[in-house]
Regions:
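General detector of folded, globular domains
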Residues: 1-96
């Protein structure tokens, strides 16, 4: 069964690849304004953009916490199996 989602561009706070830490764990950097929030990490099979919305065929969705990194940034940690994959991050509205 495939899951599909339509996400407005203004709700996506990060779109990019999952990077690797020195220990091999995956992470996503973001601004410190989201520190302490919960975030949905959406890993797509494929996606399209029409100028206002992303249309995503979902492979996996995770709900993770945003952790401090230093004074100006924070990050979300992920497993090694997600390294290099494209992802979208949307903040949970209840946690803003």
């Amino acid at each position: 069964m495939k899951l599909y989602a339509k996400i407005p561009m203004k709700e996506v706070i990060y779109k990019g690849k999952i990077k690797r830490t020195g220990t091999g764990q995956g992470y996503i950097y973001m601004n410190d304004e989201y520190l302490g929030c919960r975030a949905y990490i959406i890993i797509p099979q494929k996606y399209e953009f029409d100028g206002a919305d992303y249309y995503i065929t979902i492979d996996e969705v995770m709900n993770k916490g945003v952790h401090p990194d230093n004074d100006h940034t924070c990050r979300i940690f992920l497993s090694r199996s997600h390294l290099g994959r494209e992802c979208f991050v949307v903040i949970d509205d209840d946690m803003r």
